[in-house]
Design a protein with these regions (language model features):
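Short conserved micro-motifs at the rims of enzyme active sites and ligand-binding pockets
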Residues: 207, 255-260
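Short Fe-S-cluster ligation motifs
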Residues: 1-7, 237-245, 273-296
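Residue-level detector of family-conserved "landmark" positions at structurally sensitive sites
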Residues: 6, 34, 96-97, 125, ...
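Radical SAM enzyme [4Fe-4S]-AdoMet core and its adjacent flexible, acidic
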Residues: 23, 27-29, 49, 53-60, ...
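Short cysteine/histidine-rich metal-coordination sites, predominantly Zn2+-binding motifs
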Residues: 259-269
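Membrane-interface junctions of multi-pass transporters
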Residues: 209-253
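Conserved SAM/AdoMet-binding glycine-rich loop
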Residues: 1-61
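A short local structural element in Rossmann-fold oxidoreductases
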Residues: 44, 67, 247
Length: 356
């Protein structure tokens, strides 16, 4: 495999993560771990053993915004401090990951500028609904405002001297297209050349489907048996007809490499315009013009999203697990685990301030 992303939940809650990474490096050329950055000492220890590893710390805006969204006491400080320590160690494949929504869109460019100042990567996403996120009601309410902030980020990326950032500008252009509920700019080939494995051995095309679509299970099948099974082919057929139009880096990055002509032409055109002092506009997306001009309504766009206010999401937990959750928040269970490992439990409020 050329790339593996380890995500969660929070991967560093697992005390055997180093063992998992060690095994994965026997099969994968590159590994990136997505984390909230809370377990600084564990992250540093893993980075010392695997200095080539990538670390993306989820930070949902500047300090106040991040801590409000994530509900982690001192969450921004912990993530920021972890990133600084990783850079001081000489690690290069580290950076921020931000999921953009109404609450944090105004922080998008300031957070990018902070990451740029620190010489770090900056990854973006927007709200999605799926079985994996145990969510069906995520939706962008003020699309023009959020799109305007993506527009500003795109122009910042195009001004850089980094071709990698120019292609990230294209990815963010696709996020504007996504939040307006439009068809993907590039085909989705999940389950054909990319896949998702959960902690229980179930192999799925991705983590963006409405319901859990299982191709097979590695605890009872060999990889070749699973990959070429009738069940896997049935799931691929669903992917061929999927209308969710997700735009997440896990599916888009392989597509950008596979169908390079379209993003490359976009990049060449818009970098040339940037050099001439001309800026990218969100209104290059026809749907943005249609909404501005009253040709489509907010209700029309809401219908195009994957948001379903009446949906009952199956969280995939067993009856025993659901019983254990009665009367508790997920955070309460995580806090109990965190405290059992000698860490301070998180709180919902934060009075800390960070100068940067």
């Amino acid at each position: 495999m050329y790339f593996t992303n380890i995500t969660g939940g929070e991967p560093f809650i697992r005390t055997d993560l180093n063992d998992i990474v060690r095994e994965l490096y026997k099969k994968s050329d590159r590994i990136v771990i997505s984390t909230n950055g809370f377990f600084t000492d564990r992250i540093i220890a893993l980075a010392k053993e695997f200095p080539q590893i990538g670390i993306r710390i989820s930070i949902e805006g500047l300090e106040q915004t991040n801590n409000e969204i994530r509900g982690l006491n001192d969450g921004f400080n912990r993530g920021y401090t972890t990133l600084k320590k990783l850079r001081e160690m000489g690690m290069t494949d580290v950076g921020f990951g931000m999921t953009v929504q109404d609450k944090n869109a105004p922080d998008l460019v300031p957070l990018y500028q902070l990451s740029n100042k620190m010489g770090m990567e900056f990854a973006t996403a927007s709200l999605h609904n799926s079985f994996y996120f145990v969510e069906a009601k995520n939706i962008i309410h003020d699309r023009p405002m959020v799109a305007k902030n993506f527009e500003a980020l795109i122009n910042e990326l195009l001004k850089s001297n980094s071709p990698k950032k120019w292609f990230r500008a294209y990815f963010n252009h696709g996020l504007i297209n996504y939040i307006y509920g439009q068809p993907r700019l590039l085909p989705c080939d999940m389950s054909f050349d990319t896949f998702f494995i959960d902690p229980y051995g179930d192999v799925m095309p991705c983590n963006g489907t409405k319901d859990k679509e299982v191709m097979g299970n590695l605890n009872v099948q060999s990889w070749d048996e699973l990959w070429h099974s009738e069940q896997a082919e049935a799931v691929r057929n669903k992917v061929r007809h999927c209308t969710r139009n997700c735009w997440m880096i896990g599916s888009v990055s392989p597509a950008m490499h596979k169908y390079i002509a379209k993003p490359a032409l976009w990049v060449l055109k818009h970098k040339a315009k940037s050099l001439l002092g001309l800026k990218y506009s969100m209104y290059e997306n026809p749907i943005c013009c249609d909404y501005r001009d009253g040709k489509v309504s907010k209700a029309d766009l809401d219908k195009l999203s994957t948001c379903d206010m009446n949906a009952m999401v199956n969280n995939g937990l067993s009856a025993n697990s659901n019983a254990a959750l009665q009367g508790k928040r997920g955070e309460d269970i995580v806090n109990a685990d965190v405290e059992s490992q000698g860490y301070e439990a998180t709180k919902r409020d934060s009075s800390s301030k960070l100068g940067y």
